[in-house]
Amino acid sequence: MAVRNSPTGKKRVARSGAVSSIALSAAVPKLADSGRAGKIKTGDIPPVEPKSKKSAPRRSAKSGAATPAAESAPVPARAPEPPPIAAAVPPPLAAALAGSPEPSAPTKTQAPRGEAAASAAAQSPVGAPLPDIEALSRNIGRFVEEGGKVLAAYLSARESGEAKVGAGQEVGEIVTTLGRVAEYYASDAKRAFEAQNSLSKQFFDLWSSTLRRLGGEQVPPVAAPEPSDKRFADPEWRANPYFDFIKQAYVMTTRWADDLVKRADQLDPHTRDKAGFYLKQVTSALSPSNFLATNPELLRTTLAESGENLVRGLRMMAEDVEAGRGQLRIRQSDARKFQLGVNMAVTPGKVIFRNELMELIQYAPSTPEVLARPLLIVPPWINKFYVLDLNPEKSFVRWAVAQGLTVFVISWVNPDERLAEKGFEAYMREGIFAALEAIEAATGERDVTAIGYCVGGTLLAVTLAFMAEIGDARISSATFFAAQVDFAEAGDLKLFVDAEQLKAIERRMAEAGYLDGAEMANAFNMLRPNDLIWSYWVNNYLKGKEPTPFDLLVWNADATRMPAANHKFYLRHCYLQNDLSQGRMTIEGRALDLSKVKIPIYELAAREDHIAPAKSVFTGAKFFGGSVRYVLAGSGHIAGVVNPADKPKYQFWTGEPPKGEFSDWVAAAKETPGSWWVDWIEWVRAQGPAKVAAREPGAGKLKPLADAPGDYVRVRV
């Protein structure tokens, strides 16, 4: 039987017996209060006479604390096993944490066995049905079996040589960097004492606050998480003192550690930034929300499903380790719901040109007339181009076609070791230059307007500077989407690039011929570990839920490799040495000078971009020699760019040409609701307003090779 709340707020007791285990169970803090008052009917179970009120209470063998009298302890018809956490909590403290006002009063009526069992399930100590013991036993066996599959997937990849063996270098880098912070404090006794004293005082305040709360006071939190922190959204993180204490202790310690890093002012800025980044990885991993025993929602789910959720989760983990060839490749979306050319990248078009490095797609017109000047889009090769053509509602490509543009998009190959020697020069020659020649053959037009996105924008800037040196004027105007040409303040990715780390990356690329796409994907995920790693760890492997189908996350997981020569050049000459903006970069023996690029430029930055920070883009825009329209979009690196004109989520800011301080530009900028796409198309039309009859793919000198989105985009890592 179980304790049920009566309408008067007092507890009714079913049957006594097996006092110790049930009393402990009743004392465990409840994750959710059922809030239901139950009725107990008389049945065929003989009543138990209550003991005298003068009876001495029993004491716990472990704690010596008094427990409720035997007649106050409920005994179900089939006594359930108490949850594992029950035995770890002393009854008086646990009862206080659970908020029990007083021991239950005895009752003279008893419930029938069936109803009593249901009552016990409805009022489990953790606010969820108690697990079915038989189902739990089966699931434990299945859990062990699925765990074996995870181990088998892990080991088989290593035996076959597919897996990357060991992560000693990465771990060593983390330990070395954080060790320098520790040395900073250990080298000064006063500094170390102040740091320890600060944390001790905060914990004393937390203990005091918790005790006052257990005494019935309403007290504000000592350390509250940010309101936007979804990890602690479940009400029990605040309502239950036990979990509230764990949460606050975590938040407090995390902020204390982060402050230690920030105050280590004798470290060089790069080391301090790296330490902060690595600390963020550690604290994100150790969040109590990531563990079954310290997450109230996970405990409820596990009890309600008798552990079935953990079996499903481990099954998914085995699949993800196998898919990652011995590495855990956490799925962020259900990729089975999306198919290229069916419900992703569906804008009609044809591949009209192909070489070793790229396919060129020409999209079919949707207007009777088009601007005479075609548009060439140069996407990043770190990801795939269809982020600009996710679906009809979000597609920048489809929208640009509808505005009367003849759109061409480069789809980069997903390279293997055969393309290891393809460097920046090759991507310029066989990428942008080859595309310009193909566009002229397809349309008869020599003048082109171009867009470069992210590293595709950096390549476009390099190409424009090279074209200025050789007198090539085929690109008449250019747009940059979240692209950097100055890397002095290049954002979070710069944390991965210093002399030592670059040497390690170059060694790995020399062995394979490329940088594995999973390595780059992991780097991007580590920039937002709570959102892109640990939320899926909890959802997939602990809750046992398939992630929600989301096209953007499917694209995000569709990683690509980078040729060794190309990536080495990019990291060394851009991130490490910042050669492009400083005039030190050479291509084919020619020094590049961005000030010689005189064509009109539309420079788009995203306000919350952590990959190409808005300030960095602003600084880079000042190096060009022609007119520059700098526009600041709301949101980040992807959502700031893909902000559809028909259904905009964010705003944008416009102002004077980029000069002076970024903060001054922002203060004076004009905010406009809606999508920057509308502003951009007006700018494009102003650069070349002439129109011609619409051009169909294949109508020129180049015949179609395949339907869009082509073949190269389908090659996966």
What are these regions (language model features)?
Residues 266-301, 441, 445, 463-567, ...:
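Alpha/beta-hydrolase-fold enzymes
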Residues 2-357, 370-371, 408, 620, ...:
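Amphipathic, low-complexity, repeat-rich surface-exposed segments
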Residues 421-442:
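Alpha/beta-hydrolase active-site loop
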